């Protein structure tokens, strides 16, 4: 989820202008009657629509697994004769729509692989699973043209560009040539039979050469002057600007003299347990459990919040009609709330609201208020993606996300670089130099090398993926050399084991594979993939320690442990970090056993749709009371484990209703975009955060709650 490579921001901000024309040139329409005719149930069929003013396919499946087959092999149109899959959609519910576009291939030569999903579930590929899919979101109760660029079937990019009213789109799976598609399914959600039941109107499906034109503007805006959703009421919704100012001022006054508990040291460590202080954070195992040790020597468990900074912006191009008010470019009062990024306008209602509350001195007031609120809620760490100026000024321990992890001009698969090239080494040296400004700061807990490598989203055999194209690379050359040494220069043995007819090892350079030539080839590719990952990790780890010997290497914040390859890096980190979404932390004991290192959770959250926003985030609960219980359950069950030394909640501020840069619009904040804390959540956070050391040492029993499983609304 989360804020993946920041360099993607501008590309994702480029909202694609879309719309519908009756049947212009370059549009191949699907047969909607044929699609509808595949279904016998009464919940799916063609009906007259008041929204689209024509017959549409009405979809309200009786269970969450039923999908709409929009194309099967032999149908028209042809996937290779267009650039975009476009479908017109309207979701009737008062929460975001979730659609999964699933592309299937012929699996007759299928090789089974293990897959671990971001929510922590383990599954396996089988012949009934899509080969590649894209999970997409749409705003509720708005006609939307959903656009999927067919170029993304190569699986090299995870996040599709947004179009108006279309939210985030995330690709998962393996590359697929258009001519190999045998079936395409649209699967709608969320669904659980009681609280959530998907209900949609599907007006058209087509393959197009170019992006369609926009819909006409709506007559009634859906977002008010404060950035709030107009069409829904909820407890705590602000009436107007005066209400917002009054509540913010009352909160600031209530917490102006707050501090940490007396048994906490200046860094937030626990005075009741002391080790040797070194002036910087470090790790220690006391014979029973792992600890961080703060610079003064006190035992320290990191309980933090990600994305602490005064921002919650999103792009508005092509969606101006959704807003009751937008600050204009050049408006001096709200200049800091409006950004022009390469011609695309982004608006931040959170900053606009802080300007309304505090005037032009809003930033210094925000710094003071936020520091006090963090201490009031008993957070002792400023988490990833946060404003570093705020972190250093607040004198609260912080973690540092390093920028610009080394890449190369040639990418082997997604963002995996050519690790055997000298270019990778030189870029790693430049990457490490940014630590020079932080190496003497005792408040820095440590640094993350990067966040959620895209090559690690799902199970992928990296060496095999290199051979999807004839692209030359130093790593491919090294693989061929390695293979020749492994088989002692005997190409006949390779030909027999791989089912090939190569004349020599060098001719492997010109080979491409859509499928594994044999099980032995699969194993050989995987064996070399472990070498690739070792190089990927070792080279930057060698360089950062040359610049900064004082601080901990906190790892790469893997999105989840999608394959065995990710364990290989653990020995180079001081702390092994993963992002773990669930009602409890993901399994961590095996990580500690295999890496010999303690574990830190870089991100987790739980969200609901009972208040300000129409999506829950990666883990959903029914309401704010259950968000509170879920936080307590996650943190206390986590710190009861001897290997966990830190957990950071994602994130400080709610995301904007209209979607951040990539389209996420989740109710996951500690505070709203009007800077009002969620009382149920913050009270629970305060209670649990004060107990972490007693829970970790077994003095009190960890809080436990039976939280009902709820479909997550995320994309």
Identify the meaning behind each predicted range.
Residues 60-172, 195-198:
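Extracellular ligand-binding interfaces
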Residues 295, 305-306, 313, 319-360, ...:
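Polysaccharide-binding and catalytic clefts of secreted carbohydrate-active enzymes
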Residues 46-67:
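Short carbohydrate-recognition loop motifs
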Residues 527-617, 632-636:
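Glycoside hydrolase catalytic-domain groove-lining segments
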Residues 463-478, 650-715:
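Aromatic-rich peripheral "rim/lid" segments of glycoside hydrolase catalytic domains that contact
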Residues 236-392, 409-440, 513-518, 523-532:
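Active-site-adjacent substrate/metal-binding segments within catalytic domains
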């Amino acid at each position: 989820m989360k804020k993946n490579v920041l360099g993607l921001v501008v590309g994702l901000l480029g909202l694609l202008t879309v719309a519908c024309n009756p049947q212009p040139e370059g549009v191949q329409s699907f047969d909607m009657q044929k699609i509808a005719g595949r279904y016998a149930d009464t919940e799916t069929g063609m009906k007259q629509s008041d929204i689209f003013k024509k017959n549409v396919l009405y979809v309200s499946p009786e269970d969450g697994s039923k999908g709409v087959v929009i194309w099967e092999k032999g149908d028209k149109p042809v996937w290779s004769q267009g650039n975009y899959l476009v479908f017109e959609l309207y979701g009737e519910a008062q929460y975001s729509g979730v659609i999964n576009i699933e592309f299937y291939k012929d699996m007759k030569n299928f090789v089974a692989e293990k897959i671990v999903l971001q929510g922590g579930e383990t599954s396996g590929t089988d012949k009934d699973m899509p080969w590649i899919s894209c999970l997409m979101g749409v705003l509720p109760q708005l006609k939307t043209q959903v656009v999927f660029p067919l170029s993304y079937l190569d699986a090299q990019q995870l996040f599709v560009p947004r179009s108006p009213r279309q939210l985030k789109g995330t690709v998962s799976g393996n590359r697929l040539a258009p001519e190999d598609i045998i079936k395409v399914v649209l699967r709608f959600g969320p669904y659980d039979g009681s609280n959530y039941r998907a209900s949609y109107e599907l007006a058209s499906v087509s393959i197009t050469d170019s992006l369609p034109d926009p819909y006409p503007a709506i007559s009634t805006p859906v977002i008010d002057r404060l950035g709030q959703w107009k069409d829904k009421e909820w407890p705590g919704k602000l009436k107007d600007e005066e209400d917002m100012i009054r509540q913010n001022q009352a909160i600031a006054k209530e917490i102006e003299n707050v501090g940490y508990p007396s048994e906490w040291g200046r860094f937030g460590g626990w005075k009741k347990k002391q080790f040797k202080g070194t002036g910087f954070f470090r790790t220690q195992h006391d014979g029973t459990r792992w600890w961080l040790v703060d610079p003064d020597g006190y035992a320290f468990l990191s309980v933090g919040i990600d994305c602490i900074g005064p921002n919650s912006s999103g792009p508005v191009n092509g969606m101006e009609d959704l807003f009751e008010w937008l600050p204009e470019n050049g408006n001096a009062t709200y200049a800091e709330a409006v950004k022009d990024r390469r011609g695309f306008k982004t608006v931040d209602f959170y900053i606009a609201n802080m300007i309304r509350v505090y005037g032009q001195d809003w930033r210094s007031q925000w710094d003071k208020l936020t520091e006090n609120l963090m201490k009031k809620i008993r957070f002792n760490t400023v988490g990833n993606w946060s404003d570093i100026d705020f972190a250093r000024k607040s004198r609260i321990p912080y973690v540092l996300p390093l920028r610009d992890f080394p890449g190369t001009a040639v990418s082997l698969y997604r963002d995996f670089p050519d690790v055997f090239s000298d270019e990778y080494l030189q870029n790693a040296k430049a990457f490490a130099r940014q630590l020079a400004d932080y190496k003497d700061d005792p408040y820095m807990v440590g640094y993350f090398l990067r966040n959620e490598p895209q090559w690690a989203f799902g199970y992928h055999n990296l060496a095999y993926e290199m051979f999807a194209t004839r692209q030359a690379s130093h790593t491919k050359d090294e693989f061929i050399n390695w293979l020749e040494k492994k088989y002692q220069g005997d190409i006949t043995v390779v030909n027999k084991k791989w089912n090939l007819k190569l004349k020599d090892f060098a001719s492997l350079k010109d080979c491409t594979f859509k499928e594994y030539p044999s099980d032995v080839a699969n194993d050989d590719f995987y064996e070399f993939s472990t070498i690739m990952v070792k190089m990927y990790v070792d080279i930057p780890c060698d360089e950062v320690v040359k610049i900064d010997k004082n601080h901990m290497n906190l790892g790469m914040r893997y999105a989840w442990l999608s394959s065995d390859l990710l364990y290989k890096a653990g020995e180079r980190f001081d702390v092994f970090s993963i992002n773990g979404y669930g009602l409890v932390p993901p399994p961590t004991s095996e990580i500690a056993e295999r890496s010999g290192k303690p574990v830190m959770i870089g991100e987790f959250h739980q969200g609901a749709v009972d208040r300000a926003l129409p999506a829950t985030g990666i883990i959903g609960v029914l309401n704010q009371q259950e968000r509170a219980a879920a936080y307590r359950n996650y943190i206390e069950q986590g710190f009861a484990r001897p290997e966990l030394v830190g957990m950071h909640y994602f994130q400080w501020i709610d995301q904007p209703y209209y979607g951040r840069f990539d389209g996420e619009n989740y109710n996951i904040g500690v505070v709203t975009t009007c800077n009002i804390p969620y009382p149920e959540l913050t009270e629970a956070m305060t209670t649990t955060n004060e107990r972490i050391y007693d829970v970790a040492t077994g003095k009190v029993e960890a809080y436990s709650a039976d939280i009902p499983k709820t479909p997550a609304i995320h994309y």
